[in-house]
């Protein structure tokens, strides 16, 4: 779904327990070069508990936003670039979360691998052809990153 130049995608992620579903809503807004921002809003059902911390619910200690902004994408996105890497979107991950620091451990276990899979499978075509869709090094030019329909 596209709203105000942002591509919005909701992904349900089943966990080991059948009644547990984590929903990630991805709001994607892209600019060329270093002026780029992607915000992921994470919401969960309150019944989910950590395997090693059954008394703490993820609803209470959930990560609320992940913001990807600036720096180089090449370390995260293994695609053979045919142009200078500065012509492509550059992202770094910043995390805003509620609760103690072990939320980042849960994030590393469940969410970051999902992002990596999305970036390496769904964004290849978009990134490989980005220079055909927008002017090079134009920080104020918006371009939407789209997912495949079967994501």
Swiss-Prot record:
Protein family membership: Belongs to the UPF0320 family.
Additional facts recorded: Contained within a telomeric X element core sequence.
The protein's name in its UniProt record: Putative UPF0320 protein YFL063W
InterPro entries: DUF468
């Amino acid at each position: 779904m596209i709203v105000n130049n942002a591509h919005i995608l909701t992904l349900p992620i089943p966990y080991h327990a059948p009644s547990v579903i984590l929903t990630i809503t991805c709001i994607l807004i892209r600019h060329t070069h270093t002026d780029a921002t992607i915000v992921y809003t994470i919401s969960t059902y309150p019944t989910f508990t950590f395997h090693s911390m059954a008394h703490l619910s993820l609803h209470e200690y959930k990560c609320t936003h992940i913001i990807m902004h600036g720096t180089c994408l090449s370390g995260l996105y293994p695609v053979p670039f045919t142009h200078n890497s500065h012509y492509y979107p550059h992202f770094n991950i910043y995390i805003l979360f509620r609760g103690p620091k072990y939320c980042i451990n849960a994030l590393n276990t469940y969410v970051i691998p999902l992002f990596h899979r999305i970036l390496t499978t769904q964004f290849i075509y978009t990134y490989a052809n980005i220079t055909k869709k927008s002017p090079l090094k134009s920080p104020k030019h918006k371009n939407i990153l789209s997912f495949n329909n079967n994501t």
